[in-house]
Amino acid sequence: MSGHLQAARPYGSPTSMHASLHMPEPNMGPSGMAFPSMAPELYAPPQPLRAPDATSQPAPKAYACSTCGKGFARRSDLARHERIHTGVRPHVCEYPNCGKQFIQRSALTVHQRVHTGEKPHMCERCGKPFSDSSSLARHRRIHSGKRPYKCPYADCQKTFTRRTTLTRHQNHHTGTVEDAARATAEVLARNSVARSASARPTRSEGDQISNHGSPLSTPSPAQRTMSMSPSAELAAANGMQHQYNGNSSLPAHMRTDLHSSSPAATTSSGFSSNVRPTSHPNAYGAAPPPTTLEPSIEGSQGPGSAVGSPHMSSVGWASPSHVASPAHSNSGGNSSYVYPDPDSSYPTNAAAQGQMFYSAAMGLQRPGSAEPGAQSAYKPRQNELWAA
């Protein structure tokens, strides 16, 4: 028995006590013999305590008030609540000339601080002291900006930090909360209809008038007249000019039967036509261009005129201008044109030619003119007069 104990519980020799000791494994013996393993529950590391589940159901309120039906989880809470209905206030203030009664002892404790002036609760933001914790919590809303008490009237919606302030504010309202809610709903409905109507695009006054064909508006491409080429328009203009000046001995600017050739008539006729001016005019549109005030070379002149000039009416020069030139003729300058024989149009006698060009002109000198051939062109000098 003793040998078995020594084997189970060995001790080192005195000489080996001074040597470094080897710490054996918990489950190993000195000779390498393994002991039965220990239960893991004995040396397992401690587990952290679990926090209570937030979704856990609160304790059932088994104690209900017989007067108002309010439930409580503890009997003591129910007994304190019943004092509200019975009017029992067992806690009385012993301060002289006070005698106030309270249902709870905590309420009496807070009341006594009114007499003593004690304010143990202090604000950590501004350092203001308070006698109770509820007053300090109400004061903290000033710094945090929380206003939990809201006016129930829909047309007001003001918020307050204290319930008493909200109650005092509600006394100024007239009517019920339901009436205020209905009035607010009607106002919101009218505002939504007005916003939707203003968001719709409306036609401007210019768009409404444009349907009547205003002369100052730009017509659509379907209403515009087809534009002709510049060469065709100029050819038509030249033809009209030749037609106006035909069979007349007066130039175009002195004739009274051609009212359309004047600039004023041209300007007025351009705006009185049915073609409306556009931002992209196609030459002159359907109206003819303004005619040139110079006499045309195609005009047929009489035998006693020199290109229709009133100053050369006495010259007996038969002008061949009654024959149209090939460049401006209707045939377009074809090869069938034949120039007239000069013998039939001009006199062959040189003296007659000189008389035709100069004799008539000598009689047309202006009085006081210094041109050659004038009778008063030569004036004697002063020294010649003395010599004479």
UniProtKB/Swiss-Prot annotation:
Keyword presence, Transcription: yes
The protein, known as: C2H2-type transcription factor ZAP1
Compositionally biased spans, kind Polar residues: 207-230, 240-250, 259-281
GTP-binding keyword on record: no
UniProt induction comment: Methylation at position A1935 within the 3'UTR of ZAP1 mRNA is regulated by both the MTA1 methyltransferase and zhe ALKBH demethylase, and controls its stability and subsequent translation.
GO MF annotation: an example: DNA-binding transcription factor activity, RNA polymerase II-specific
Gene Ontology CC, one term: chromatin
Alphabetical UniProt keywords: Metal-binding, Nucleus, Repeat, Transcription, Transcription regulation, Virulence, Zinc, Zinc-finger
PANTHER family, alphabetized: FINGER DOMAIN PROTEIN, PUTATIVE (AFU_ORTHOLOGUE AFUA_4G10380)-RELATED, TRANSCRIPTIONAL REPRESSOR PROTEIN YY
Compositional bias (Low complexity): 191-200, 318-347
Region Disordered, residue ranges: 1-58, 191-350, 363-388
Role played: Transcription factor that plays an important role in C.parasitica development and virulence.
Zinc fingers classed as C2H2-type: ranges: 63-85, 91-115, 121-143, 149-173
PROSITE patterns per UniProt: ZINC_FINGER_C2H2_1, ZINC_FINGER_C2H2_2
Family: Belongs to the krueppel C2H2-type zinc-finger protein family.
Chain's gene name: ZAP1
Location(s) in or outside the cell: Nucleus
Annotated knockout phenotype: Leads to a slower growth rate and a significantly reduced sporulation. Also significantly reduces virulence on chestnut stems and red Fuji apples.
Pfam families reported in the protein's UniProt record: zf-C2H2 (PF00096)
